[in-house]
Amino acid sequence: MAKEFSRTRRIAQQLQQELAQVLQRDMKDPRIGFVTVNDVDVSRDLSYAKVYVTFFEEDEKLVEQKVAALDAAAGYIRSLVAGRMKLRVMPELRFIYDSSLVEGMRMSNLVSRVISNDEAKQKQHGVETDAEQGDTKEEGDK
């Protein structure tokens, strides 16, 4: 059982690399633009592959159009990748927009904003921050 899983994972990794090359070099569709293949999940029977992609654009409408263009070209992309990989059955490709990168950046910005707001409030009220308290303790120890 574990051996079968490792094979699907290896195929998913190779498929990710081949898809990235095909999408960068061989696709001439201007609707797609620059696309990054973040991850590929292959079903156990190798009949389906979920391809997680991101784009530079964050506009939902543009992202939907780009994913639709990829889905429309999935058969062509599949045939290009099949020529590069030695598989008996080439998985059917399903493209999915991966918003985890955008969400991660948004969460990071929120955390940074909260930290800076807390530091500003502490300075207004005359409360020392943890870093400043550590400096005064070291000076007192000397």
From Swiss-Prot:
It comes from the Bacteria. Residues 119-142 are annotated as: Disordered. One of its GO terms (biological process) is maturation of SSU-rRNA. One of its GO terms (molecular function) is ribosomal small subunit binding. The keyword Cytoplasm applies. Keywords: Cytoplasm, Ribosome biogenesis. It holds the Pfam family RBFA. The keyword Transit peptide does not apply. GO terms for cellular component: cytosol. Its main location: cytoplasm. It is found in: Cytoplasm. Monomer. Binds 30S ribosomal subunits, but not 50S ribosomal subunits or 70S ribosomes. Belongs to the RbfA family. One of several proteins that assist in the late maturation steps of the functional core of the 30S ribosomal subunit. Associates with free 30S ribosomal subunits (but not with 30S subunits that are part of 70S ribosomes or polysomes). Required for efficient processing of 16S rRNA. May interact with the 5'-terminal helix region of 16S rRNA. NCBIfam families: rbfA. This is Ribosome-binding factor A. It comes from Shewanella pealeana (strain ATCC 700345 / ANG-SQ1). The gene is rbfA.
